Amino acid sequence: MRLNSLSPAEGAKHSAKRLGRGIGSGLGKTGGRGHKGQKSRTGGGVRRGFEGGQMPLYRRLPKFGFTSLKALHVAEIRLSDLAKVDGNVVTLDALKAANVITKDILSAKVILSGKVEKAVVVKGLGVTKGAKAAIEAAGGSIEE
């Protein structure tokens, strides 16, 4: 077997439709587009969500909610992620160095999710009540 002798299985590939190449092809004249109308024309067609002039669903329904821009720069850190940091002092820079958070994060908060395996000192990060209790139970501490 050689690369130049490889070919797809019989019937696995369909030949492309050759539109407008005579009536014998079955796709001559109108080329499968039907007669007249917007969709038969070059460049014809309607945008996504267009409902023929009727007020579309996305405009009939009310707007709601918003996207907090603060959330783009604040990260949630699980307790289990604290073990990924080298050493026992966890800071924002240490989390970035361990690839737990991305470099564009400006602040972070430790949440109660997972388990703390070792005693760690958390510096300069927000901590929830449950996470604080879990860190202190493991022999760690929180520093502002």
From Swiss-Prot:
Pfam families: Ribosomal_L27A. Transmembrane segments: none annotated. One of its GO terms (molecular function) is rRNA binding. Keywords: Ribonucleoprotein, Ribosomal protein, RNA-binding, rRNA-binding. Binds to the 23S rRNA. Belongs to the universal ribosomal protein uL15 family. This is Large ribosomal subunit protein uL15. It comes from Glaesserella parasuis serovar 5 (strain SH0165). The lineage of its organism: Bacteria, Pseudomonadati, Pseudomonadota, Gammaproteobacteria, Pasteurellales. The gene is rplO.
